[in-house]
Amino acid sequence: HSREPGPADDVPMPRPRRRETPEGLLVNRLAGKVVSAPGSALREAFRVAGRFAGDPIGTTTDAVKFAMSLRRVLAPPDTPHSPALTGGGSGYRLDTFDVAFDDLKASGRAAGGSVNDAFLAALLGGVRRYHEKLSITVDFIPVAIPVSLRTDADPMGANKFAGARFVAPVGEPDPKTRIVAIHDLIADARLEPALGFLDLIAPVVSRLPGIVLSRLAGEMTGLSDLQASNLGAIGRPLYLAGARVTRVYPMGPRPGIPAMVAMLTYEGTCCIAVNFDPEAIADAAAFSSCLRAGFEEVTALAHGG
């Protein structure tokens, strides 16, 4: 207290308390639980996450490693959002285009990567071109993708995926270098013990109030500028009311982010669908055109480009 109405000059003002986000609270809570959990619970956690299956967890060291991995998995990407992919609303715009599967596969192989690596490299190349068209220089953007957790021990046909966030090299002009960088980023992500943590916490999270779940989901999904997903392939012809289906475009959800790009391969064609926010992406026509150019840039590698 004071005898004067104004603050005393020689008394420092108290520092404001740091506001915890729902995601931050969840990280701290889970990290503490993992460190203090008994060995049997940790074994189950690692089993569900697809890591260290069958190995005994007998020391605190492994628990601490899991907790540290959990912090890395949930930490916001260490790069700012792109100024060209800002804002956001409830509207959406859909765009579709096709790419030859053999070309995309050969392009990935030319750089020592996969079809998925080439797909992501093409998207980043398109986003880079969009920034250049707007005279904006951006080296990295936060990107989210699903990562396969399948191992040789999993049964044939089993699918195991977990969401991962990356600081993606959108400013890299060389498509081969982008493919290599993406391949390495995904390989590193697969080594995180806590990557499949959502399977571990699902029984607990499902009991949270709806408003908490909504805020938590918004915080976790809204950290990226771009989300992409390669949904694999349909291995047989499809028919609708007797008519043969010629294309299948996967319209992926856009969970509070500027753009969601999904790819599904059908009869030798990569069917690509873009769901983007017209309020976050001001020049929709340019964005679509640049994405197509990004794929042309990458698929040129298949022909010695």
Predicted regions and their residues:
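Soluble acyl-CoA-dependent acyltransferase catalytic core bearing the H(X)4D motif
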Residues: 1-257, 261-292, 296-305
